[in-house]
Regions:
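Motif I (Walker A/P-loop) of helicase-class P-loop NTPases
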Residues: 10-18
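Conserved Walker A/P-loop ATP-binding site and its immediately adjacent core
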Residues: 12, 25-50
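Conserved RecA-like ASCE ATPase "motif II neighborhood" in helicase/translocase motors
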Residues: 57-108, 112-133
Length: 170
């Protein structure tokens, strides 16, 4: 999903999340940059716009577990390796993800998510952890959202991060 700055990408993300919930998806992860203010802003907006969801922040594991998928859950997480590793462990330790597809929305997908160590024949920590999170469920959808898609479009197909299709709006 590609759009200009301040073009309504967040509204489109929330609309897609709501539509996917209507189709039976129960677990959503919305990744923000590693900026606390942006993560909190997105979290507050999700609380307001997705009021039929159990919206959780990075420290809301008890709320996530208590919900027990009675309502669709949206986790708003920073792209921070420690936060992502903790939630990967949380997913692995519960049965919620085992039989349910995982819908991941990566806001600013060109920041931190692609493997930044590909030229060193290594895998960056965030990229490795995101791959591990995807593997905690039976299947996953990974939606990349950006206003600057160049690094995503230049990914190799074997990297597994190159978009299969692009939806652009202005």
């Amino acid at each position: 999903l590609m759009g200009n700055v301040q073009s309504g990408k967040t509204s489109h993300m929330f609309g897609l999340i709501a539509a996917a919930a209507d189709q039976g998806f129960n677990i959503f992860v919305l990744l923000t940059t590693d900026n606390t203010l942006l993560q909190e802003q997105t979290f507050k907006r999700a609380l307001a716009d997705l009021d039929t969801f159990c919206v959780c922040g990075e420290n809301d594991y008890i709320r996530f577990q208590a919900n027990a998928l009675r309502k669709p859950v949206l986790l708003v997480l920073k792209k921070n390796v420690h936060v992502l590793q903790q939630w990967k462990n949380n997913f692995s330790s519960t049965n919620f993800c085992a039989g349910n597809p995982l819908f991941i929305v990566d806001d600013e997908a060109d920041a931190a998510s692609p493997n930044t160590k590909v030229n060193q024949k290594d895998v960056s920590a965030i990229n490795r952890t995101l791959n591990a999170i995807k593997k905690t469920s039976s299947s996953s959808i990974y939606l990349q959202v950006t206003g600057t898609p160049q690094s995503l479009l230049l990914q190799t197909k074997i990297a597994g991060w190159k978009p299969q299709f692009i939806y652009y709006f202005a």
